Amino acid sequence: QPVFKSSMQAIVASATFFEALYAASRECMPPARLAPRASNGSGAKRSALVTEQLKRAFGLKNAKAGDLASVLSEVYRFRDEAVHPSSSFGPAVLHPELGVLVERRLAMYTYANARLIVRAALAYCKILPTLGEKQGPKEIRDLAHFLLTAAAPLFAAWET
């Protein structure tokens, strides 16, 4: 149970990083360059809205934006299961580490999955500002520099 809770917390924290980056990038950009908000009734997924904002803010090309969209789709899927769980139980699934049948969410929130999602968040904490400094709009450069400087100790710890 401690691994389940810790994994869930790490995954939600990773999603919160992307939410904070979304909000910070909206603060930096002029209104004409902002991605549309969800309030337009489009029903767009949160991961797609965040992807579009980060694409515009950090100057991502379509291929890199596609990679980010794929990662964010998974991050938000895991986050949504933790924050907005279904009240119904589905069929039991085999836990990848314990080898026993468990409720689906118990199999989702493992150390391995948390590690992958945290590493993805840290990778994008480095990738996005690095690209932003080189090819992003000038309004994002201060935020990009701050992210690279503030997170440098984390990069060193996770890249070894």
Residue ranges of predicted features:
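Short, solvent-exposed segments of well-ordered alpha helices
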Residues: 1-12, 66-73, 104-111
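Flexible secondary-structure boundary motifs
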Residues: 20-100, 111-124
